[in-house]
Amino acid sequence: MSQALDYAKRLIAAPSVTPATGAVFDEMQAMLEPLGFAVHRFTRGEGEEGSDEAPVENLFAIRHGPEGSKHFAFAGHLDVVPPGEGWTSAPFEPEERGELLYGRGAVDMKGAIACMVDAVANVPQEAGTISFIITGDEEGPALHGTRALIDYMRSEGIKPDLCLVGEPTSVNRLGDMMKIGRRGSVNIWLEVEGTQGHVAYPHLAGNPLPAMVEILRELNNLPLDEGTDWFQPSNLEITEIDVPNRAHNVIPAKAKARISIRFNDTHSGASLSKQVIEIAEKHGGTARPVISGEPFLTEPGAFSSMIAAAVKAETAIDPEPSTTGGTSDARFLRSVCPVIEFGLCNATMHKRDEAVAMADLDTLSRIYARVAQAALSS
């Protein structure tokens, strides 16, 4: 059994549905300390289980190189989404079948973290400083995870030169895509207050629905942009409409809706929120925005070339630089240093029978080792 495969099995076998704490971090620590890493673990969040403030465990590990050497960071998350029903094997009992390893987190992203650990075993300490930024809160609210790790790093004066996040970016085969950026995301809750009444006496009531319809119509037709060189066009989607009204003959007292905007770097979360608030207020409504991330772009250059060269050397293919897809914790790490995402094939992430090709684990480990070596010698 390869070392990367063994590490992946150990991590998968430690259940860690978001927010993650405990055993899976014990495994991670047990893997890193024999490789010379100093491991610091801490918990943030003091709320009840199931709430956004539920406790989250985080891990920062560092192996110092010579004084003045470069610092390269690996980042990722050990929490996983709930497994759901219908698996053909137990989701937290890793199982080899044919060429695949099955288990929740196999590709998102315990498999990639296993490859990172295996990779650093093949990078000599004298090459430079390597760290791990690992959270148990990426699949959930992401309030007490990577943000808290960044706060810790800043308090300790720790600043990597480059960071690679192990999200499953590959599409059809390992190495065909890396993420050099991501669009931003803002969710906005809309509300219009009315006056409840009988439908036969509309003059004694105030129907909030026509105003909500006008708000949503204007938002749905709002021109955003046509995209940029690296980003697809921004899009606004109506994701929820709700009227707490179960009777057919009652004019409701309130109408609620929610929209979600994924936006490129021609906007900011604040600028879009301002537009939506103005439209809502024009029609007598209110808007409450929650910005979950700003767009970021690590423009193609030295870092992306390092990754491309490593992928080419191990797979003979050229990875496509892309900014498609959802948000990740790279949106927080961008404030620390240049960051790029690269990892396993994503076809089975968040699905039942999540699985990774075992050969890909060894290949990804070698790619990560090449990237780390190149980053530390740059």
UniProtKB/Swiss-Prot annotation:
This is Succinyl-diaminopimelate desuccinylase. Zn(2+) 1 binds at residues 77, 108, 167. Its EC number is 3.5.1.18. It comes from the Bacteria. It comes from Erythrobacter litoralis (strain HTCC2594). The keyword Iron-sulfur does not apply. Belongs to the peptidase M20A family. DapE subfamily. The gene is dapE. It catalyses: N-succinyl-(2S,6S)-2,6-diaminopimelate + H2O = (2S,6S)-2,6-diaminopimelate + succinate. It is an enzyme of class 3 (hydrolase). SUPFAM superfamilies: Bacterial exopeptidase dimerisation domain (SSF55031), Zn-dependent exopeptidases (SSF53187). GO terms for molecular function: acetylornithine deacetylase activity; cobalt ion binding; succinyl-diaminopimelate desuccinylase activity; zinc ion binding. Zn(2+) 2 binds at residues 108, 139, 350. Keywords: Amino-acid biosynthesis, Cobalt, Diaminopimelate biosynthesis, Hydrolase, Lysine biosynthesis, Metal-binding, Zinc. Binds 2 Zn(2+) or Co(2+) ions per subunit. InterPro entries: ArgE/DapE_CS, Bact_exopeptidase_dim_dom, DapE_proteobac, Peptidase_M20, Peptidase_M20_dimer, Peptidase_M20A. The active site is at 79, 138 (proton acceptor). Homodimer. Its cofactor is Zn(2+); Co(2+). It holds the Pfam family M20_dimer. Catalyzes the hydrolysis of N-succinyl-L,L-diaminopimelic acid (SDAP), forming succinate and LL-2,6-diaminopimelate (DAP), an intermediate involved in the bacterial biosynthesis of lysine and meso-diaminopimelic acid, an essential component of bacterial cell walls. The keyword Amino-acid biosynthesis applies. One of its GO terms (biological process) is diaminopimelate biosynthetic process. Pathway: Amino-acid biosynthesis; L-lysine biosynthesis via DAP pathway; LL-2,6-diaminopimelate from (S)-tetrahydrodipicolinate (succinylase route): step 3/3.
